[in-house]
UniProtKB/Swiss-Prot annotation:
It is found in: Secreted. It comes from the Eukaryota. InterPro entries: SCRL (IPR010682). This is Putative defensin-like protein 233. Transmembrane segments: none annotated.
Amino acid sequence: MGMWCTTLFMVSCVSICLILSHVQEVEAGAPPQDCWNLVTFPAKCGIHGKKKCFKEMESKYQQRFLQCTCKNLKPEPKSPKDEHDCTCQRANPYECNS
């Protein structure tokens, strides 16, 4: 009887430890997804479009970006202005909503 109680106690302790460690992992959650911003700016991309987008986006958001792409937009018939889209990945995905 004494050995059975000791074994049951040990199994209970191990089970509780495993359950608690799993709960802590679930509460921590998965890391956030990459955060991308797309903004349209006036003028064309030019030769150094990526650098231009880095500067424009960092100026607009006051944050650091990891990578950017620049894409010239086709002018609409009503608007003769040249425009480009900057798509950039934020360095800190936790600041995605700001």
